[in-house]
């Protein structure tokens, strides 16, 4: 049974990556370019709402009826999703600028990697996001221990802490297009980038759980702001026949650092516990995250300007 659960979880993980990449690739085919940020924001708000506020209580209710019933309901939801996708009208085949012969899988991935690496804006964006995610998971790896042993949260308080990310995601999905339109893409990305080290300093020195709750809401909001702008940018400047492949390579850079960050976070606390108090050891990843996050902001922010983003859009639309 354990092996079956592991294999199933692995396959679900693969399917989720495929779904996420396909959804981002499909979006420009059903939404006008000027509405991409609004559409992406609404999609992330809906995902945060259903994943964190509707799904868990509904699952608990269904389990109360029968322990096996959630699996059948979940399976049925996929059939509903397939039917909804099939109801979308239009042609979604990639459009090639010139006729070309079909490439094999390895050559297609290589082509997507080469296109991304040659792009003066998307290449640093992918690397910057990878660094952000690595630092984020470095502090997140031991968050449960931090909440229990440093903030001394009860079970109920920890459950409330868990709602912060979803609340921020919902609000961020709604406000992100408006913030981007009013402040500009560049300053909006600076805000999201700066929130990492600022949040790490404030959380790493916090003594009250509700302070961490509020900071997590704002951090989640700015993360959605970053995603809304950068995903919409990719959708508007990557050629349609390369969008899926370039997105996949981009996500490899962005997500590949996550397990590294988790390993580093656990390692830092484990080693520091031998020389520092337990509380200091659990605070240390946040302080390190703040230091490296500040360095990342100094290096990355000059590349993330509204002019650079608009220039990339203009070149893609020539």
Label each region the model flagged.
Residues 21-36, 43, 243:
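Extended non-transmembrane interhelical loops and adjacent amphipathic helices
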Residues 17-25, 29-30, 56, 141, ...:
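Residues that mark transmembrane-helix kinks and helix-interface sites
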Residues 86-114, 309-317:
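Flexible cytoplasmic inter-helical loops of multi-pass small-molecule transporters
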Residues 2-9, 13, 38-96, 156, ...:
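Hydrophobic alpha-helical transmembrane segments
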Residues 2, 66, 110, 117, ...:
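C-terminal transmembrane bundle of multi-pass solute transporters/carriers
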Residues 24-25, 51-53, 255-256:
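Hydrophobic alpha-helical transmembrane segments of integral membrane proteins
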Residues 84-100, 224-233, 237-238:
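Juxtamembrane interface at the ends
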